[in-house]
Amino acid sequence: SSDVCSSDLIHNVESVLVTGASGFIGSFIVEEALRRGFGVWAGIRSSSNREYLQDKKIHFLELDFAHPGELCAQLSGHKELYGKFDYIIHCAGATKCVDKNDFERVNYRQTKCFVDTLRELDMIPRQFVFISTLSVFGPIREKTYTPITEKDTPVPNTAYGLSKLKAERYLQSIPDFPYVIYRPTGVYGPREKDYFLMAKSIRRHTDFSVGFRRQDLTFVYVKDIVQAVFLGIEKQISRRTYFLADGKVYRSRAFSDLIRKELGNPFVIRLRCPLIILKVVS
């Protein structure tokens, strides 16, 4: 039957599970994994938007990270049919929350639960990729404007950064766990919405910025993150942490000027909001 053939094919290729597969970074990782010939499983919620997951070769696996018992059943059911995954790329997480406690719940506790379940079921992959963030460090070199190094001590100043840091430290605390952590800076590219809103604002002749002090910005293109992830898989690296950026530093004004240039240099009114107001609002 076609099911048997499909199952045989799945067993004969290296398998990769991408959690958060319907998201910005996850959807591009799925595309590249397919292009490289992996058996690709998209880890999604039942409510996930599948707009960028249309390829017929994608296998879907619903994962309920909020309920440990359900998650265990879903993963053990997969193991029974197909065995464990060769690689897991964990993109699932929260970047925006109304309640700050949700960052801790989703980014730390649910990641911990996921990893604990994999260990319990003997489903530890060859490599567990964790997509973290530069935000784990916080503004530690804000006064000197010098580059962050691996030897710096993270001091996150947001609930988001703290939740990702706690998840990182948990992975690092497990002896012999084959993690690879990537900390992208500001990620841009197709399907991204935040920088798109900034471009939209400039096109409508308003350049809005926060604070009156110098702001240095760093960026990385989404497809460069994808290439880094698969290079790490190719090289079979383990228990390493990497920053991902394009190697350049931009002043906030220079960044908005770049967007203006791409939009044909529309005139703009520059508005600045004091940082204290943003902190009160958030």
Where do the protein language model's features map onto the residues?
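Mid/C-terminal beta-alpha module of Rossmann-like enzyme folds, strongest
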Residues: G232-S282
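NAD(P)H-binding glycine-rich loop region in Rossmannoid oxidoreductase-like domains
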Residues: E62-R109, C113, P139
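Catalytic helix-loop patch of NAD(P)-dependent Rossmann-fold dehydrogenases
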Residues: R141-G186, D207-G211
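Short, small-residue-biased leader/transition segments that mark boundaries at the very start
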Residues: S1-S6, F255
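Conserved Rossmann-fold NAD(P)-dependent oxidoreductase catalytic core, especially the SDR/UDP-sugar
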Residues: H90, K112-A159
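Substrate-positioning beta->alpha
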Residues: L162, K166, E192-L197, G211-I233, ...
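N-terminal Rossmann NAD(P)H-binding glycine-rich loop of SDR-like oxidoreductase domains
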Residues: V16-R36
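Flexible, glycine-rich beta-alpha linker
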Residues: F137, V180-L197
